[in-house]
């Protein structure tokens, strides 16, 4: 047995002349450990294909991102056109001073939201909502910064004003007691509410979305009740 052991050592030394005596023993022991730790291929699990729902969600996200690249180019001319169309409608009874004060407040975004008032039918309203949500999703894909959250807040604030304006006009025309008696005070309050909204939305993104969805559902319910009567 000892002769066989010496012969094995000599043969290994001949194959590796640069190695010193006894180094092959360490190599053999390391090799043996590796062999013992080898995992059979039959036990290795292959990666599963992506779930169908996950793939569909990724497609929707890609579609929203694609929409977000087109929306700004479309909304800019629409914004300018609607300012021209609704200028006389909104400012019909306003003096020059009132126009300036109203414009310095939130007149610009309210004029744009007048275009959304044309969404009389629920199907068209839903499509506009989807476009704005898609645009917001594209904005949200950018790094989260305060300015980015403000852009998204502007989108949703525009949508809210689209319903706040007709409700305000309705109360003013049918219920005189709802008027404060001072248009300037009313506009200042409106600006303060918008500023408060910005603070809430920027500091707590997503909070307003849930309230906004409930708000839209209530508006649709009120509309259905009025249509039945």
Curated annotation (Swiss-Prot):
Biased composition (Basic and acidic residues): 1-26
Keyword Cell inner membrane: no
Top-level taxon: Eukaryota
Gene knockout outcome: Simultaneous knockout of wtf15 results in normal vegetative cell population growth. Simultaneous knockout of wtf15, wtf11 and wtf7 results in normal spore viability.
Topological relation to the membrane, as annotated: Multi-pass membrane protein
GO biological-process terms attached to the record: meiotic drive
Keywords carried by this UniProt record: Endoplasmic reticulum, Membrane, Transmembrane, Transmembrane helix
One GO CC annotation: endoplasmic reticulum
Membrane-spanning parts: 71-91, 100-120, 151-171, 188-208
Family designation: Belongs to the WTF family.
Additional remarks: Although the gene is capable of encoding two isoforms, RNA sequencing data show no evidence of alternative transcripts.
The protein's name in its UniProt record: Wtf element wtf14
Species annotation: Schizosaccharomyces pombe (strain 972 / ATCC 24843) (Fission yeast)
Lineage: Eukaryota, Fungi, Dikarya, Ascomycota, Taphrinomycotina
């Amino acid at each position: 047995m000892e002769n066989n052991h010496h012969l094995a050592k000599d043969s290994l030394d001949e194959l590796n002349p640069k190695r010193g005596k006894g180094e092959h023993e360490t190599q053999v022991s390391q090799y043996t450990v590796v062999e013992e730790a080898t995992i059979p291929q039959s036990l290795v699990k292959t990666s599963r294909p992506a779930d169908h729902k996950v793939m569909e969600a990724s497609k929707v996200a890609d579609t929203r991102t694609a929409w977000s690249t087109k929306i700004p180019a479309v909304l800019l001319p629409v914004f300018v056109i609607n300012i021209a169309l609704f200028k006389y409608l909104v400012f019909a009874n306003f003096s020059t001073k009132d126009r300036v004060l109203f414009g310095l407040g939130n007149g610009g975004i309210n004029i744009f939201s007048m275009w959304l008032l044309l969404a009389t039918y629920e199907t068209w309203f839903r499509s506009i909502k989807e476009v704005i949500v898609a645009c917001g999703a594209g904005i949200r894909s950018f790094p989260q910064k305060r300015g980015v959250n403000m852009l998204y807040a502007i989108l949703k604030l525009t949508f809210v004003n689209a319903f706040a304006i007709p409700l305000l006009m309705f109360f003013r025309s049918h219920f005189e007691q709802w008027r404060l008696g001072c248009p300037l005070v009313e506009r200042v309050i409106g600006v303060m509410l918008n500023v408060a909204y910005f603070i809430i939305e920027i500091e707590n993104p997503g909070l307003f979305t849930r309230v906004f969805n409930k708000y839209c559902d209530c508006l649709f319910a009120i509309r259905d009740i009025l249509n039945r009567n």
